């Protein structure tokens, strides 16, 4: 730990503190002293220009004051978690508020019925104009209606978890938050949870501390059905993440990405070299690769669950074929899934891979200045095509067989020296085979995405992606 390292590096430091008064050393609260040292070190690291952005953010998070999250059942940033277990024990029904939380005057709660076209359109427009955009306000997610139905209407969805806030006077939808039920495994424990998503506020509402109210209200509704754990993601560091991920972007249409400002602009030889290095063949190379069909659902479920369970400590569990059919059967403009027929076992699948479509709107033309709807092009700037969106594919789930039957010869076992090292050797060989297979599948996914007209292929450094 950082504090132990500091004391070992300067053993006289602690002695000087303990000997600086006549108070017996035993009366000092060593835990508080450690926390103070940790805070000082974190404060210093948060301002260190030599540290990475992630290191600075994590350090800043340790000393940040979160008025809302400090009241919630989440670990504190400085807290060391040693054991698995629920942060929030189940509540008795009489402990759960039956009525919604009070909203500021002029606002009212509502349910958004995703299956009603007019309400779906309201929700879509709220996201389109107010949801996630990059730090420079150049791009914003542009969800299709069909994508939102896919995301919010899985088997077992709860209409009460599609929570909106309207203006009491105009009835305009000004805020939204949603949840869907998910089954998760945390090591060897299966837990029913809520996955929270699409927290969105109208830009005019962001100074009124509405987000905590939305989170509390959807939490209340989740509690009412006996669920007391939830998972969610955030674009900023909040206390305390189970995991942090970084996006990686693989260009499929480098010229367009440069013209829109998504990628750094290159010219001449640099551009030609980049385009050449990103070249992809027109056909996939994995034998037996084809689009997923309805008849594949059962095998994909077994393949995916087995892959997740043998590779990761925290994972979703797909309990029914209906879930697999919903999330993975190909939907035009939403999700694409490909399976591989096993050449060694006719009728069986050896692998699958999927990606989903989420375009981004281009908010600012490169080289242009926006003002009252007029784009003024600076002198000497070559006009660029008026792109309105970037077509992005996102790597979704994948799975490959994990039972490769790797064995060691007697000579190899003796060379390992112990049973433990022999098992490690087998595991390393299996991992190498899985890595090679997944790399081949991912390359084919790039080829298929490019052929489908995507401009960029995105993925997070999670699962085996890293």
Describe each PLM feature range.
Residues 159-179, 322-366:
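Conserved beta-hairpin
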Residues 162, 252-262, 273, 332-340, ...:
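Aromatic/basic-lined ligand-recognition segments
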Residues 297-307, 312, 331-340, 344:
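Beta-propeller domains
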Residues 296-309, 349-352, 360-371, 378-387:
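Membrane-interfacial loop- and helix-cap regions that link adjacent transmembrane helices
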């Amino acid at each position: 730990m950082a504090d132990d390292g500091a004391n070992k590096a300067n053993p006289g430091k602690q002695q000087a503190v303990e000997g600086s008064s006549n108070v017996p050393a035993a009366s000092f609260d060593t835990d508080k002293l450690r926390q103070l040292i940790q805070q000082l070190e974190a404060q210093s690291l948060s301002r260190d220009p030599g540290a990475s952005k992630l290191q600075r953010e994590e350090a800043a998070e340790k000393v940040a004051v979160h008025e809302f999250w400090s009241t919630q059942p989440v670990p504190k940033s400085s807290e060391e978690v040693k054991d698995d277990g629920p942060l929030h024990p189940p509540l008795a029904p009489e402990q759960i508020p039956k009525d919604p939380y009070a909203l500021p005057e002029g606002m009212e709660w509502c349910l958004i019925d995703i299956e009603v076209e007019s309400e779906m359109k309201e929700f879509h427009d709220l996201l389109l104009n107010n949801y996630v955009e990059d730090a420079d306000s150049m791009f914003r997610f542009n969800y299709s209606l069909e994508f939102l139905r896919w995301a919010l209407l899985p088997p077992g969805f709860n209409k009460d978890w599609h929570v909106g806030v309207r203006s009491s006077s105009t009835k305009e939808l000004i805020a939204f938050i949603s949840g869907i039920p998910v089954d998760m495994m945390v090591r060897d424990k299966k837990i029913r949870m809520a996955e929270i998503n699409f927290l969105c506020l109208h830009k005019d509402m962001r100074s009124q501390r509405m987000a905590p109210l939305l989170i509390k209200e959807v939490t209340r509704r989740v509690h009412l059905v006996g669920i007391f754990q939830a998972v969610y993601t955030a674009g900023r560091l909040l206390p305390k993440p189970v995991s942090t991920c970084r996006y990686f972007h693989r260009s499929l249409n480098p010229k367009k990405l440069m013209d829109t400002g998504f990628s750094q602009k290159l010219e001449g030889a640099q551009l030609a070299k980049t385009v050449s290095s990103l070249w992809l063949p027109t056909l996939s190379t994995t034998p037996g690769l084809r689009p997923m069909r309805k008849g594949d659902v059962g095998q994909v479920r077994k393949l995916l669950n087995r892959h997740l369970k043998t590779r990761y400590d925290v994972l979703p569990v797909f309990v029914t074929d209906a879930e697999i059919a919903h999330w993975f059967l190909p939907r035009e403009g939403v999700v694409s899934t490909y399976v591989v027929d096993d050449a060694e076992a006719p009728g069986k699948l050896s692998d699958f891979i999927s990606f989903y479509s989420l375009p981004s709107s281009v908010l600012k033309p490169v080289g242009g200045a926006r003002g009252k709807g007029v784009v003024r092009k600076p002198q000497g700037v070559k006009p660029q095509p008026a792109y309105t969106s970037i077509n992005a594919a996102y790597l979704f789930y994948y799975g490959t067989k994990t039972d490769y039957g790797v064995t060691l010869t007697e000579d190899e076992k003796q060379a390992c020296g112990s049973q433990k090292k022999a098992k490690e050797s087998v595991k390393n060989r299996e991992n190498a085979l899985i890595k090679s297979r997944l790399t081949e599948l991912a390359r084919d996914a790039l080829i298929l995405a490019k052929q489908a007209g995507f401009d960029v292929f995105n993925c997070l450094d999670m699962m085996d992606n890293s």
